[in-house]
Amino acid sequence: MAEGDDFSFQTGKIKTFTILDYVLFGFTLVVSAVIGIFYAIKDRNKNNTKDFLLAGGNMNPIPVSLSLLASFMSAITVLGTPAEMYNYTFVYWWIGVSYIFVIAGAAHIFIPVFYRLRVTSAYEYLETRFSKGVRTAGSLTFCIQMILYMAIVLYAPSLALNAVTGFTLWGSVISVGLVCTFYTTLGGMKAVLWTDSFQIGMMFAGLIAVLVKGAESVGGMSQAWSYAEETGRTVLADWSPDPATRHSVWALVVGGIFTWIAIYGVNQSQVQRACSCGSLRDAQIAMWINLPGLWGILYLGCLIGITMYAFYRHCDPIQFKLVSASDQLVPLFVMDVMGNVYGVPGLFVACLFSGALSTISSGLNSIAACVLQDVIKAYFYKDMSEERATNVSKFVAGAFGLICIGLTYVASLLGGVLQAALSLFGMIGGPLLGVFTLGMIFPWANTYGAYAGLIGSLIFMFWIGIGTQIVKPAIPKSPLDLSQCNWNLTTTAASVTSLVNISSTRVSSVISSTMEFTHNATLVSTAAISSAAEVEHGPLYKLYTLSYIWYSATAVLTTVVIGLIVSFLTGRTKASEMNPRLMAPLFDIIFPFLPEKILRPLRFGVRYDMIKHFESDERHTANELHPTEIDKYFDTEMTEKEQTSRTHTMNPDSVIWQHMKHDDHNVDIFSNNPGSSTQALVELKTYRRI
């Protein structure tokens, strides 16, 4: 037990914030707003969607990497990861191993396809590969996902701080929501990227301060580790192959790959950031630079959890009724160990809300891109002017920002209904990853297969998720002690809990219990676990005990299996007719050292070499010829050629021929004689999507 006589478990009272703490919180908001104003003024003459949604498409990889990190390392992560260590074991650290494969897969399998197409919305790919309907279904699913996620990210830290410190709940919700909406709407993607960079710095500063001061309060990090070791919290590995094991090495590494690649590989927010880089190489560099940051936030959170357990090892604040849920432990810990250090709790508040700001701003900008590209332009105003499109994007971002704020208010009233709604959110990312995987990896998949795979996977995952919430299988926790709680102050301590009203307490439990289902693999509520209902084990019970970390992998497998079966039953796409720009050469990427005679059959007939002449000079791909323009040229050129003769000579000055001349690895069907280029076009057209 930490030395001192003014800690919450001894006095029954929780320390409160000072004026300086509120000033530091306000400072974070002001700096974020100023960055938005700066870029609004600086780029006032660049009123186009490329600048607003893609930051002009020439961003440096450093701010992009920081924004990639900040977008989904949210306040829920700051609250949830330490709570995981406090309640369970250190096995969770294995999720960091999966990050290596996540970044590799995202940077070298998925992102090159999106970058090659120069998309603004990731779901444009689904229309090109399948159909407009699949694109719309994917885009709307993503928007619902992000709206729910943004609301929880905004509400969770506000509620946790309010419950522990009395920090004004709706004051923080409204101020953070409005400032975030303001600078995102005003400054666009550049403002989002640079505010994310500032906010990730605040997150690291806050986490480091909490760890240093927390370790000091228990006699150092080694002493904290020893205390945790006494109760088995320092177990480093669980090699159980049982998929019901909540956190095994297999689940955290293999399941974690699918959970996180759904974020870094195909999520609109991350794809948009990657496409804002000046080149594919810069986008890949940004991805890899982001990796140490992922590890830093993860392991800082893990170590804070160990010190937090060491501090409360003889008096669990939840059972002592100081707080009502695990997501309130970190703010309580901050107030206990740093409440007397003037202004430092405010640094933690800045850290917490920086995570919220970065996530919400990224979400608003990505939703604006999807609504503009996938709904408004796709169905209503295809030929909208750039100025008007930019203004519409700003309006959409602002409108959804207000919706996000409003949804947090509704969240405080819905209670159990909200729990069911938010549980659905966690099962969406896997099916979306599945439909992109189906399109990029399996050339035989067709539109019917994409529809069936996406819908079937969503239904199956909803079934598992809802069943899990009903059954609530018990999950054992590491031991917690109450031997040194000051029970004479039980009444006083209980009165502290009254800082949270009834509805807030209910939603706090909802937030915690829903955290497991989110993409950043955050954590389950202690309250939900302890209240697990006793039910009769039916034949499907094992399905409902599936570890949440396997959800994305299960969803991807379901999507691909259903999608391929339906595709073959309804007339598969011929691999030889597949446009290679829409595919990812998986085996070439994973096994580049294999000889050509082995790799050739593993390409399943897709002619990836056909695209090389468009990629040999990246300047052409990025700036001079958009892929849709290439397709349009094919359609026009082939119509004219086929009406006359396949031996008609192609114009040596045409843009396609100029691109062909840049290919240093000439394919057999392309010769240096322009007279034979028509046949090249005939053959090349067969590799487009029919």
Named regions from a protein language model:
Residues 1-690:
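Membrane-embedded helix-loop-helix hairpins and adjacent transmembrane boundary segments
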